[in-house]
Design a protein with these regions (language model features):
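Class I S-adenosyl-L-methionine
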Residues: 156-230, 610-616, 625
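Signature of N6-adenine DNA methyltransferases within the class I
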Residues: 1-8, 15-16, 30, 34-42, ...
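Generic, well-ordered alpha-helical scaffold segments in large soluble proteins
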Residues: 18, 196, 200, 204, ...
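Active-site-adjacent bridging/hinge elements
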Residues: 84-97, 191-205, 259-260, 344-353, ...
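Non-catalytic DNA-recognition/assembly elements of restriction-modification systems
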Residues: 463-507, 519, 526, 635-698
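Structural motif
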Residues: 98-115, 123, 127, 186-191, ...
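Polybasic, glycine- and aromatic-enriched phosphate-binding surface used to engage nucleic acids
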Residues: 18-20, 24, 479-642
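Charged, often flexible domain-edge or linker segments that flank or initiate folded functional domains
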Residues: 1-166, 209-326, 330, 691
């Protein structure tokens, strides 16, 4: 059979790196292609898997890079997952800590034994099973007693046996590691203790490669509560008993635990590709449902009958949600969950997804985008989808396709901005609720919760694939539209040169804090403030063709140019007429708008009006070229420009330690700019108060 080859782009997707990083690795010899066709590099699938495994194992030096933390391995306590008052929280913490200290290898058998022990002890704590007297001080023997068939647990046997899997291997492991089972667990209603334990002992590297970031219980409770309320308000009472609810990426069943309190057992469906997670989810669902029944009927035992057990096995399955079956699909009234983020699909699955899904583009596949598309396909008309997703899905360019799918099939019902909810993951998240609609693409009536504030969008904003404007109140949005549609304006689109700062490829090698022969000062983003920049304290070798990435030198040497902070939530532009080089944290724009002076354009870009447009339209920490090009620039006459430029020159010349004078000058300039936009005093006060920060950055 012939060797299968993949492109550089596909290799980058497999390694979870950008294409730019892949090109750099290729250029630097960190990776090697196996053949070239028409100038394009190709890599054998065997080689691609070798590189990926080298990253996972740490053999590949680039693993040490900050950008490749995805492949770091180890065990860690997932402290945001359960409620603070969960009684087993400290128990799991101590066990996980002990495993880290002992550097115990977490084999599949080890994980299964530890998890089965936890499941069995939770069941015992609820039911007070017979023959358990006297074992409180011999916790390490309980699972062994069960394995040797000295404990009758009825229908629960199938669930516990599935978790154990191989009893012979379990016996051997227990004999060698009894101390690790000297742990007590009590059943905690509404808490996924098994999930907490599983995440805390599972290899972090494999968890991240699978995109597994399990949802904290408080977020799950909010989602389930809101979606059930929404559903029962829209579904006829007679139809409520026929509703189907699906978690397509159920993990260990945290959503199922909360759903089973309000949805009948037979109406709950779930799936996942992790077999052990599914087995734990089945146990969790069975125990929660049985405990609910025990409470409601005031009986002494948790009642799990064969009929309920069969429902659980029929409805909670180990399968790939994204694989479309030939048989007719079942439609659901609710789909809820937390789809995987950044899952590393293999080559065959990527090929399959490319053929089946609009969101599976050739430039890379984001797993949660495809989950949203598939879920909307399986949602009944009027049905509700609610997922935990990165906030980036609202407006980042890479997610344009999924926004188009959403706009073509649904309306937005609710958005909650929940911040960095996942342990060890710095990525702001949202819970996004969509309602399947035959007349889709609307936001009217959407409930928004952000930064402690709640509001409802009353005036509809049609959903655009370019970005979903749901962060703003109606008043903020109306002001934004007025500014963007100001008359007598132009823009920098097609009327400016843009350039990135220099990427050296090795800052330790090429950048010095001392001026040496052949070196010149270089401006960094941290040096730049509005209208000027600090004296440089870094130096770089001249001759920019030696570096990994540099713009044509004539752009750095332009007689005058504007430089700006690339990574920043505020627009910060400075004037440079000394032909300075800049690093990649500091980019360049050279306006060529006929009739408009460069310092005048700088005054507009540094204004609160421009900041409002940038902040409210894009909510970005990166100032992109497209952001700058979108800002309307008023066409001022020569007299007004001259007046502003005199004030700008005065501000530039004003010493930095004279903060009061600089701020007054900034405010005076800003007042003229706002009048050019036609902004009255009341709207100007609103704009100033609506900005997230009041820093002058002077």
């Amino acid at each position: 059979m012939s060797e299968k080859y993949i492109t550089l782009e596909e290799l980058c997707g497999l390694l979870s790196i950008t294409k730019a990083t892949g090109r750099n690795w290729l250029r630097l010899g960190k990776i090697e292609s196996q053949k070239q066709i028409d100038g394009q590099e190709y890599f054998s699938e065997e080689y691609a898997l070798y590189i990926r495994n080298a990253l996972v194992s740490g053999e590949f030096d680039s693993l040490k890079s900050r950008r490749n933390k995805k492949y770091v391995s180890g065990k860690a306590f997932y402290d945001k997952y359960v409620s603070d008052n969960c009684g087993s929280r400290e128990t799991v913490f101590e066990l996980a800590g002990g495993l880290i200290e002992s550097d115990e290898a977490m084999t599949d058998t080890a994980m299964r034994v530890i998890l089965a022990d936890c499941a069995l002890k939770q069941l015992i704590s609820v039911d007070n099973l017979e023959n358990m007297e006297g074992l409180q001080d011999r916790e390490e023997e309980i699972l062994s007693i069960y394995i040797e068939n000295n404990m009758d647990i009825g229908c629960w046997k199938r669930l516990i046996d599935d978790i154990i899997d191989d009893k012979d291997k379990a016996r051997i492991w227990i004999n060698e590691n009894k101390d690790l089972l000297r742990v007590h667990y009590d059943y905690q209603p509404g808490e996924d203790v098994l999930g907490l334990l599983y995440m805390s002992i599972k290899d972090i590297g494999s968890r991240k490669a699978a995109g597994s970031y399990y949802t904290p219980t408080d977020v799950v409770k909010q989602m389930v509560s809101g979606i059930v309320e929404n559903l029962y308000n829209t579904v006829e009472k007679n139809d409520a008993g026929h509703m189907r609810v699906l978690d397509p990426c159920c993990g260990t069943g945290n959503f199922l635990i909360q759903l089973s309190k309000v949805i009948p057992l037979g109406q709950i469906y779930a799936c996942d590709i992790d077999e052990l997670s599914v087995q734990l989810a089945r146990f969790n669902l069975a125990l929660t449902s049985s405990y609910q029944c025990k409470k409601e009927k005031a009986i002494s035992k948790t009642s799990l009958n064969i009929e309920d057990l069969n429902k659980i096995y029929d409805n909670i399955t180990c399968r790939n949600f994204l694989t479309k079956e030939d048989t007719e699909d079942i439609y659901f009234d609710v789909i809820i969950g937390n789809p995987p983020w950044g899952y590393a699909f293999d080559c065959d699955m990527r090929d399959y997804l490319h053929k089946k899904y609009r969101t599976a583009g050739r430039r890379g596949i984001e797993s949660y985008d495809v989950f949203v598309e598939r879920s909307l396909e399986l949602l009944a008309d009027g049905g509700v989808l609610e997922f935990v997703l990165p906030e980036a899905i609202l407006d980042v360019r890479n997610h344009r396709d999924v926004r188009q799918v959403i706009a073509d099939n649904s309306d937005i019902g609710r958005v909650r901005f929940v911040g960095d909810v996942f342990h060890g993951v710095q990525c702001p998240a949202i819970t996004l609720q969509l309602v399947k609609s035959s007349a889709p693409g609307h936001t009217e009536g959407a409930a928004i919760e952000r930064n402690g504030q709640k509001f409802v969008i009353c005036n509809d904003r049609h959903l655009s694939p370019d970005g979903f404007q749901v962060r703003l109140s109606d008043e903020e949005y109306e002001v934004l539209l007025r500014l963007e549609n100001t008359g007598n304006c132009t823009s920098l689109r097609g009327q400016a040169d843009f350039a990135l700062g220099i990427v050296t490829g090795d800052n330790k090698k090429y950048i010095s804090v001392e001026l040496q022969n052949g070196m010149e000062p270089v401006v960094t983003g941290a040096d730049v403030y509005r209208y000027g920049h600090d004296k440089c304290d870094k130096y770089i070798l001249s001759g920019f063709d030696r570096y990994q990435q540099a713009a044509p030198e004539k752009l750095y040497r332009a007689p005058e140019k504007l430089i700006y902070r690339f990574i920043n939530r505020q627009l910060v532009f400075a004037y440079d007429d000394r032909q300075m080089a800049t690093l990649n944290s500091c980019n360049i724009v050279i306006p060529h708008i006929q009739g408009l002076k460069m310092k005048y354009v700088m005054a507009v870009l540094n204004s609160r009006i421009a900041q409002y447009i940038y902040e409210k339209r894009y909510n970005s920490v990166k100032v992109l070229r497209s952001h700058i090009e979108s800002i309307p620039i008023p066409l001022a006459d020569e007299e007004i420009q001259a007046q502003l430029i005199r004030m700008v020159d005065h501000l530039i010349e004003c010493p930095r330690d004279n903060a009061e004078e600089k701020c007054k000058l900034y405010d005076d300039i800003d007042d003229i700019v706002r009048q050019l936009y036609g902004v009255n005093s009341a709207d100007y006060e609103f704009i100033k108060n609506a900005l997230s920060g009041c820093k002058y950055m002077l």
